[in-house]
Amino acid sequence: MPGRQLDPRLVVRDLVQSVVPYDERESADQQWMLDWIDAGHPLFRTAKPATPDRHLAVYAALLDEAARTVLLVDHAKAKAWLMPGGHVDPDENPQVTVVRELNEELKIAPPFHARLGSDAFFLTVTETRPPHSHTDATLWFVFSASQQMEIVPDPAEFSACRWFALDDAGAWAGDSDPQMHRFMAKLTSALELAPVG
């Protein structure tokens, strides 16, 4: 039916359901997210800094596959090296959110990774740091990128941007998202298994 609007809750549920869990933790987080969605809880942040106290967020993994690196940003508020991303606006499709955030934060519009697709690749349920601790239910998307691409970081958001090697956990494992090591392991495994071309 032309012009028919999709239910935002069903769009989110489909994205969550489409993730193939990498480990027991991701499987448990996926079930938590599905139960949360199905229980009718609010999904979207409606007021800063953290209302409601559980809400959707997205990360954009910018992957230079040839160099085997990902871009992390030194997030000013979180005081940690994270993927670019942000909170999902009310009733917004998270796939739209992640593209919007890349444009707003870095002034780029890269394509979703050709082999990994435009669906969420990874998901996490994480308690954020004080002073405004809350629960982020985060969908992680993978984009094709290059270390040579021009990025214009928003200085209000980021202190720095840097490319990190996928297989150099010592470089990125310090002050970053607590689930970054699991994401990097899943991404490395998927790149080894994903068909080329």
Indicate residue ranges for each PLM-predicted region.
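Short N-terminal secondary-structure initiator segments
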Residues: 1-27, 95-114
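N-terminal strand-loop-strand
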Residues: 45-83
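Short low-complexity stretches enriched in small and charged residues
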Residues: 14-17, 60, 93-100, 116-120, ...
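Short glycine-rich, low-complexity/disordered patches
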Residues: 27-31, 141, 196-197
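Nudix hydrolase/Nudix homology domain
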Residues: 2-9, 13-17, 80, 134, ...
